[in-house]
Amino acid sequence: KAGEFYTPHEVSLLMSEIVAYHLKDREKIQIYDPTSGSGSLLINIGKCAARYMGSDSKVRYYAQELKENTYNLTRMNLVMRGISADDIVTRNGDTLEEDWPYFEENDPVNTYDPLFVDAVVSNPPYSQAWNPTDKESNPRFSQYGLAPKGKADYAFLLHDLYHIRNDGIVTIVLPHGVLFRGGEEGTIRKNLIDHNNIDAIIGLPANIFFGTGIPTIIMVLRKNKQDSDVLVIDASKGFEKDGKTNKLRACDIKRIVDAYKERPEKIEKFARRVSRAEIIQNDYNLNIPRYVDSSEKAESWDIYASMFGGIPEAELQDLSAYWTAFPHLKAALFSPDNEAYCQLNVQNLKNAVLNHPDVVAFKTAFQNAFGDFDAYLKSALIDGMMRLNAAGEEERLSREIFARLAEIPLVDRYAAYQLLDDDWKKIAIDLEIIQTEGFAATKQVDPNMVLKKDAEVQDGWVGHVLPFELVQSVKMHEEVAALRAKETRLSEIAGEYESYLDELSEEDKEQNFVNDAKDAFVAAEVKKAIKAREVEPATMSILKDVDALFAEEKTLKKQVKDDSAALHQRTKGVIERLTDEEVRDLLHRKWILPLMENLNSLPDAVLDDFVKQLDAVCKKYETTFEDVESQITDTEHELLGLLDDLQGNEFDMKGIAELKKLLGGE
């Protein structure tokens, strides 16, 4: 993962989704990465295109890379992914110095034939130095200008733009400085806007790239756009932490891609379609915060409510989406003091919210929308597992979920999509196995190979598709329960040892039947002490109980070991003898039930968040400044009374007298 050639999978996937969508109606496509690195961008585009085209065999890949070892990695990765060598064209060279025309060596000028493709994708090195000398007439740069020699970002961008066909598309990762830096870059940016080439700008989260915290964007460019707007997306807030870096989640990628596809006028705090006239008004500055404000509202304090109490209507209005969804709830929870402030009039806020008819109706509507979704999934995934198109099935299911959520307020459809994607990862693997190896693969078990002392050895078995734990919980629950009971008893014995240790005196803990750390009994020494009969009766009673525990523990450990081995071996046999119907039931439990459980939890998550926000607003002004002042006064009076009872020498009493003055006493 060297930073100079590694593009995070999620960024690569995002760019690929945009490109694949643009090229979805084409029978064959050619794609080119002029700074190919490991080849991940090209590989992901092939996968995404397969969803629309039915096969990635209709894709021809072009790649150019400066560093020889990385160039070799590109070709190797493409071949290892099953891509035909006939569909791979790679070059080892400097993209900016050695453009990719085809020509005959003996007549390069008259036989010049530049490469034009359907899509160019790239993640070039950021702000790299280059040599613009004598390149003014180069066809890649002549219409737009030359990037400054200290920053080649726009040189790479113009190279990419030049190499697409008139109906092609470019996606390129760049440092965000290209959006607003002046000089030669400002000129190029102006020309790109005037030529109507910039289709979209996507601001990425900070620290998303390995080894650098440079803020980055993805710019989408086209040659023959029909509209002159630029879609600006601020995706900087959607991510999860992954060690020291930030990582786009599946829901973040889909939210961005959907915004690109739909090109909305505005999505609050996320995206906006910006006219060319507005960009010109801003002197061609494309800095994202000029067009999309994704900042969170700063918390403020209402001075009136802080002094006199009450809940400001203005702050309740911040929850307007909930009041719209639950039109009668607000009146049931609050009574007005005046036109601007109100009081909470229920004792238990959470119960009042959850039991209100509007909220009950909301949960019922969700249940109705997804009431038959389990059956829908069973029909699609279980009944149709051998014939469905696994590459496009997740997208089809996401459309179904979005359609069911269309009339359900408050539930974030992208949160639902994330649940689907989390589940889909295991489903997709299983489907690939079943479709390529046959349904019999579901009844297969494989040797569980582990590494021991630098050698691979077998340690039991694993289900090829069906996990042992799942099969045991469904088909062998009595045996599992018996084994778990013994394991539980072993845990209890460990706790009993600790209790008996606590009962010993410090003198007893110095005896040989307790170890040097004084945190465990020594089994052999316990037996000796019992036999010697040289301890107090109370201690003897403890030692006999401990000795009995040692015996019970030894027996249980052997039973657990033997039972576990027997259960494991029997599970292997159960999987191999499953009927087809039993397999389908187990797949339903593995694939569908967890997804349904997670989806059905979404309304509760919405309501929990609502109650949490509402409770915070109500408690914010529970104690007024007047209450605080009264508490301070009461405390001062109490302290004055205590001071009156104090006695001391002359100097102590003078000090106490002065303190009483400060506290408002005589």
Model segments located where?
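Extended alpha-helical interaction scaffolds
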Residues: G463-V465, V471
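Helix-turn-helix-type domain boundary/helix-start signal
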Residues: E4-F5, Q64, N246, E576
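A conserved structural/catalytic subdomain of Rossmann-like adenosyl-cofactor enzymes
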Residues: E97-E98, E104-D107, T111-W461, K475-E478, ...
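Conserved S-adenosyl-L-methionine
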Residues: F5-S122, S127-A129, N138-Q143, P148-G150, ...
